[in-house]
Amino acid sequence: AMAVLTRSSEQLLARHDQARAIQVAETVISSEQASAGQQRVAWTVLAHAHFDLQDYLQAESAYQQVRQRMSPTSKNYNAINERLAASIYKQGEAAQASGDTVAAVDHYQRVRQATPDASIVATAEFDAAAGLLAMQDWTEATAVLERFRNNYPNDPRQGEVTRRLAMAYLAKAQPLQAAREFERIGRGHADPKLRREALWQAAELYTTAERYPAAVGLYRDYVKQFPRPLEQAVEARQHIVLHHQRTNNIREQQRWLNDIIQADQHSGTQRTDRTRYLAAHAQLTLAGHAHQQYRHTSLTLPLKKSLATKKRLMDNALQQYDHAAGYGISEVTTAATYHTAQIYSQLGEALLQSQR
């Protein structure tokens, strides 16, 4: 009798009569006369029928029963495991559709716990992370996203994972981690505009995290890869100048100051008030360096030779200040005029001291 009922439940399921298939399968399951094999078949019919009726909670419970009655090496084990994973995942989808993000995330995360080998685990993890981000649970979201990155390195969604990690670390106020994610986008994204914006943001975040060499490296890359728009590229050069000023690397500072001047000078219609302003200040700083060199060169015997050197350095400094004043930026012109007068006064003092 049990064999007939078991077969009958399978036939009813095949005819898509899920309601009667469930009734017959439950009769077999509750009978003490049913063999282990018949019980397993009945549980399988019950699970499939509930799944077909979109009763995923009951389907999950039944698939768990089927799986317990199977050896992991048996032929249908993987198929049952996949269906169990799908039953849990579908509960997550339903919760999400009804607006219950907390429950949805819980279901998505259960997929990995219950069926770690199922093919849908990656999607469940990805969707769990999306829900956690929506809930602003940044800590758990970053943990899930980092795990996804490590477990599925070849997944086509890795680019989106990086973008989401960047935003989550930014929201968590972890500038160093956020910088690393934006740098990934800046180096790997297909869209040049997005790459440009990400590189810039990464450089700013490295600065916030006080990782100055990393920031400078990215600003250099930015100038190389994105010379246009000009204004932003000149701003990048200015950041590099400020870094070398902080570290007292005069040679590199002068190199990038010259680069600012050249970039502004040779850019025609791309020039803006801001690039002219930065170029004027760059020229004023270079003039200041020339002025220092002139000031610190003493007049010594034989006077004729040292005076010629001093005069050459003086002419260079005067020329540099003249270039700075030529930009027509009032504060720069004022400073250049003041320092020009200083240079002449300092020559007089140097001559008086040498005669003593």
Can you name each region flagged by the protein language model?
Residues 1-356:
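Acidic, polar-rich low-complexity tracts and alpha-helical solenoid repeat scaffolds
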